[in-house]
UniProtKB/Swiss-Prot annotation:
Catalyzes the formation of S-adenosylmethionine (AdoMet) from methionine and ATP. The overall synthetic reaction is composed of two sequential steps, AdoMet formation and the subsequent tripolyphosphate hydrolysis which occurs prior to release of AdoMet from the enzyme. It comes from Nostoc punctiforme (strain ATCC 29133 / PCC 73102). This is S-adenosylmethionine synthase. The keyword Cytoplasm applies. One of its GO terms (molecular function) is ATP binding.
Length: 424
């Protein structure tokens, strides 16, 4: 008997209060790494009505104007009208910054493997910036090897922002959320159950002043200008049974930091796989690459995506764990959920042979310290909204599948060797 079930993921627009914070944090990171690639950064941001607080720990040789960086990013997002209770020019920006703890720095600067003279390898010189667990995931249900629900939620959120910025739907405002419920049958997406969009808007639209009429206009426009274009190249499409919900409270005029406070690192499921895979709990934004919350999560995605791209599993989840001040992972776990074409022990061997998972090695593989300067001063801020994974619109090193053929060949060789041994 086939199993039919629903799975839901959400996304938010760049104007959501939490995402404002993520983007300011990563704008600061970009600026610091551009001037000083060795900067140690843990930049946290809080926003509320008329207020931005930048706090955290930063050790750097760079000289940047944090206040100007925050205002510029807020304006880029679209908050330029003081009447909305939050705008680039009128908001107060407060700073409360310290340097990185020397107790932490000594373990990052010189890993335990080097301090105890257990290794003289280059990649053993830098220790993990903290303990923790990180997950990476990939699935073959979309071309970008991401789960369909989060992929659709991001697409709708990005399209929602696009029609606002181009003026196609000029009454929209920056804050917004999306949610998509996908119908699955035997583990494969077969339909769209529900599409939800909550979007900030003006109180009236032209001469339309009645609240119900305003919402009817928004719903009609969002279907034609946002939803239909998103599903144009998607095989699984909404039908006449699909529920389409828009601003279910009845209106969404008060939004952004005036409606809700925001905080860096509060949208970690939106940033990753939409709940389809497990999450270790660590946020990404505002953290330099020595923080394995970020860099190791990127590495785990890279491993998972290459395994699926190689055809060795239909979906796979990778767990990594680290100890603060230690270079080598304390554990690696592979789970193919029964979809593997080779056993998980073989996949673990392939990971150990072909992927570098020490922090210094991850930084080197992805060039994480130099990407901001090489890309005109902005890199991390562009992944701070609409997801860090599956981004076909961005050239992200951890999204490359350059090891897929190598893994496929190595897996075939391992299988041939196992067969030969069994026959002797």
């Amino acid at each position: 008997m086939s199993r039919r079930y629903l799975f839901t993921s959400e996304s938010v627009t760049e104007g959501h209060p939490d995402k404002i914070c993520d983007q300011i944090s990563d704008t600061i990171l970009d600026a610091l790494l551009t001037q000083d690639p060795s900067s140690r950064v843990a930049a946290e941001v809080v926003v509320n009505t008329g207020l931005v607080l930048i706090t955290g720990e930063i050790t750097t040789k760079a000289n940047v104007n944090f206040v100007n960086l925050a205002r510029k990013k807020i304006a880029e997002i679209g908050y330029t009208n003081a009447d909305n209770g939050f705008s680039a020019n009128s908001t107060s920006v407060l700073l409360a910054l310290d340097e990185q703890s020397p107790d932490i720095a000594q373990g990052v600067n010189t890993a335990q493997e080097t301090r105890q003279q257990d290794s003289d390898e280059l990649f053993d010189k830098i220790g993990a910036g903290d303990q923790g667990i990180m997950f990476g995931f990939a699935s073959n249900e979309t071309p970008e090897l991401m789960p369909l629900p989060i992929s659709l939620a991001h697409r709708i959120a990005r399209r929602l922002a696009a029609v606002r910025k181009t003026g196609e739907l000029s009454y929209l405002r920056p804050d917004g959320k999306t949610q998509v419920t996908v119908v699955y049958e035997d583990g494969r997406p077969v339909g769209i159950d529900t599409i939800l969009i909550s979007t900030q808007h003006t109180a009236t639209i032209g001469e339309i002043t009645d609240e119900a009429a305003v919402q009817a206009k928004i719903k009609q426009d969002l279907w034609s200008a946002v939803v239909e274009p998103v599903f144009g190249d998607i095989d699984v499409k909404p039908n006449d049974q699909t529920r389409f919900l828009v601003n279910p409270t009845g209106k969404f005029v008060v939004g952004g930091p005036q409606g809700d406070s925001g905080l860096t690192g509060r949208k970690i499921i939106v940033d990753t796989y939409g709940g389809y895979s497990r999450h270790g709990g660590g946020a990404f934004s505002g953290k330099d690459p020595t923080k394995v919350d970020r860099s190791a999560a990127y590495a785990a995605r890279y491993v998972a995506k290459n395994i699926v791209a190689a055809g060795l599993a239909e979906k796979v989840e990778i767990q990594l764990s680290y100890a603060i001040g230690v270079a080598r992972p304390t554990s690696i776990l592979v789970d193919t959920f029964g979809t593997g074409k080779v056993d998980e022990e073989t996949l673990l061997e392939l990971i150990n042979q072909h992927f570098e998972l020490r922090p210094a090695g991850i930084i080197h593989t992805f060039n994480l310290r130099n990407l901001p300067s090489e890309r005109g001063g902005r890199f991390y801020q562009d992944v701070a909204a609409y997801g860090h994974f599956g981004r076909a619109d961005l050239d992200l090193p951890w999204e490359q599948t350059d090891k897929a053929e190598l893994l496929k060949q190595a897996a075939n060789e391992s299988l041939s060797a196992a067969i030969a041994q069994a026959l002797t």
